């Protein structure tokens, strides 16, 4: 299992999801839920799309990866690896944020 999975792409998904969740939650925690938080979240997503897009497609969301699998654009192994990477990135971001603001 996972012999053909592109680990560079999975690593990009882990890092991309980490940055999206960490910066997004930090922005909303410090700037509030108004324009500043939304702008920081959107700007982070835009930068990640340009940086991670060529490497992994910049899914950053298990629903996107599962949708690509359902439309036969990804293999089952790649989908599982992407989803696990995205979940890991989100948990690492939460732990980093909890450590930062505790």
Where are these regions (language model features)?
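Membrane-interface helix-loop junctions and terminal tails of multi-pass membrane proteins
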Residues: 1-102
């Amino acid at each position: 299992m996972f012999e053909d999975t592109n680990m560079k792409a999975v690593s990009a998904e882990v890092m991309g999801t980490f940055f999206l969740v960490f910066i997004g939650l930090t922005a909303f925690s410090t700037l509030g839920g108004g324009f500043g938080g939304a702008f920081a979240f959107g700007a982070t997503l835009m930068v990640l799309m340009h940086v991670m897009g060529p490497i992994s497609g910049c899914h950053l969301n298990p629903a996107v990866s599962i949708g690509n699998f359902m439309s036969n654009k990804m293999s089952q192994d790649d989908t599982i690896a992407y989803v696990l990477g995205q979940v890991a990135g989100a948990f690492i971001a939460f732990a980093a944020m909890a450590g930062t603001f505790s």
